[in-house]
Amino acid sequence: MGKENCTTVAEFILLGLSDVPELRVCLFLLFLLIYGVTLLANLGMIALIQVSSRLHTPMYFFLSHLSSVDFCYSSIIVPKMLANIFNKDKAISFLGCMVQFYLFCTCVVTEVFLLAVMAYDRFVAICNPLLYTVTMSWKVRVELASCCYFCGTVCSLIHLCLALRIPFYRSNVINHFFCDLPPVLSLACSDITVNETLLFLVATLNESVTIMIILTSYLLILTTILKMGSAEGRHKAFSTCASHLTAITVFHGTVLSIYCRPSSGNSGDADKVATVFYTVVIPMLNSVIYSLRNKDVKEALRKVMGSKIHS
């Protein structure tokens, strides 16, 4: 691409998920419904954990942070995506694009580490129940959660600082529904080898470390479950672990497929569809899998609703 086609940009144009007019209403209603459920479930979960004393445990401490992160990064992306479905002007300012990417990246990396911490928490609870409250003390919980947010912030700052150094772009049209880094980098005129290499290395390192923690934790949990004498206890534990691993597999699978591979130079429709799963669907599924299927949460919700009705 010749240098004469390169220029600075003041704004980007987000193409969105589809340019087929007949799909606009269906897409809008579908994602509005998913976003509504996501907000209600995650904010409701946070509130329930705060008001219910029986949920003041390490597991629900981390679950409240997961709900907060899911709420945040879904809200960073979905409202703008919904607005762009019907808007002819799909522009987002350069600054707005960078801010959206930074906040999104911070939340996603935080969730990557938070899911690993939650897997470790389940390992301690099931495999070492007598030491659970000591091992996962308030101080330890705060330190682990803080580390997750710190890793998310640092990784995002690295990518943001490198992205801000790109002087010229050959186009301002992003083939995506939000400002993700790979499609933005594909528009750069300058050499982005460092950007792409760091994106690959950081994502691969984060994924490798956290997946290893998750797999090790659940393997040890599985070993403990198989030793249980109660068939009902085994079934309940298997069901819980299977649902957790399903959500984790979908989340990490899409992250791996998009960020932990050599750059293809563009963001195709397959990438956009895959991205929908961990930016829109997973925040909703997490609230269902980690909370609505949980007996303690159901009991706490029933107690809170009962007290409201009788008051």
From Swiss-Prot:
It is found in: Cell membrane. One of its GO terms (cellular component) is plasma membrane. It holds the Pfam family 7tm_4. This is Olfactory receptor 5L1. Keywords: Cell membrane, Disulfide bond, G-protein coupled receptor, Glycoprotein, Membrane, Olfaction, Receptor, Sensory transduction, Transducer, Transmembrane, Transmembrane helix. Disulfide bonds join C97-C189. One of its GO terms (molecular function) is odorant binding.
